[in-house]
């Protein structure tokens, strides 16, 4: 329906039963409109619970489910890598809202939606598989960021311990298996069922997002050792200079949240860094007076 109420396309279906069921329909718009919305209504009384709603064009980029116009804009930037699934979305504010790989794979309509740090709800329709496929389609290097067993430290952080921590570590290992494991493996079989029997390319794993301190280093070490035992070819990325405290480190993702003056004063910050090392930084200039 366009903003003045004109119906551009419509369809109907009969809903029955008490089970969660997928319904599909095709809508063909009578004309172009840049200010329209999808409206769902019931002609008769009753209660309908909606679990997952998606409106997508028939033709997606390379048939892989993403809008062609958006992907082509990204392609035009000639990106070399993609860090996903994001930043604070990885950590969550509670253990239940922390990102888990297994919630983001399989049929999109069966994935649980979650309310994330920035106060919006995501259906997780753009999940682990879709990010890997996008990287493959555009020739980008995938850089997966896993939860390290703690929620956002910028808020009231919750530390996972015991079985909860073990479960989160296993989730990371399962994600790697999904990406690069054999199609005969547990998670490789699911990948194959999603249309990609051959392993994806995935080299980099960032352990945690913007985490720091002794609690982080304990969890970083735990994940680092487990990953290297099973997947020695994976290159890991730390959130801080953990090597200063005796932890193994291959690459550090330096995060800076500060003013423009802070960056201007440190224009020579990297002058003495080893030119043969891998450098990865995430700057975010901001003015505290306006942000």
Which residue stretches match the model-derived regions?
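An acidic-aromatic substrate-binding cleft motif
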Residues: 43-117, 121
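Aromatic- and acidic-residue-enriched carbohydrate-binding clefts of CAZyme catalytic domains
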Residues: 90-126, 155-168, 184-187, 191-206
